[in-house]
Amino acid sequence: MSNVLQDIFKDHYEEMLYILHPRKSVIENVDRMINCGDPSFGGAMYGCSKCGTFKFVPFRCHSRFCPICGTKYSIDRTTSMSFKIINAQHRHCVFTIDSELRHFFLENRKLLGLLFDAVQSVIFRAFYKDNKSECFTPGFILVLHTFGRDLKWNPHIHCLVSEGGIGNSGLWRSKKHFNYTFLRNAFRTALLDLMEKELGVSFKKVKARCYQEHKHGFYIYAKPNKCNPKIVTKYIG
């Protein structure tokens, strides 16, 4: 039995293929999703040794794009993240980029990894600045979202970071104040430097324009919100 999403893509498959010209990975995931649960693609037969009843279970596609398999993946992922969160107050932060940079990540998906590298370096530096000898280390989880609420391409990083960290002495130190000026400027600098290193001299003009148009850095949401880590992991997962 097909679901609504499968029916939509089956009805408009050729339009998607010949008008939108999606990437190979997109086509592969759509194909898998369309055929998910189709008995003609195989399955497993289970039998009860007591009553003699047999049940055939068709194979699933295991694609995150699939509304059935993707939901299971999301549940497993959020469960895994919840086990890794330390018992401390956390802050939900969102790191965004200049709209002019978005097409670079759309055309080369490998660049998305730079977002993680940039955010990670900023978080470590923010805690390091508090006490350079102790070098406090926080606990944090980074999750990439590639689309905004309007469903348009808008890669950004959601970060769940502990409001405190462990120092070299083994002591825990709380951190309630997050310096917005530092976070915005540091993230802008870290990301643009990484992109220039990856893209070469052709990126220099774009980099200079970003500094000129974003003198206060890229927008970052990091307000104190007393977030419930379990609720946030469900959202960002």
Please give the residue ranges for each predicted region.
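Beta->alpha loop/short-helix hinge microenvironment recognizer with preference
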Residues: M1-G237
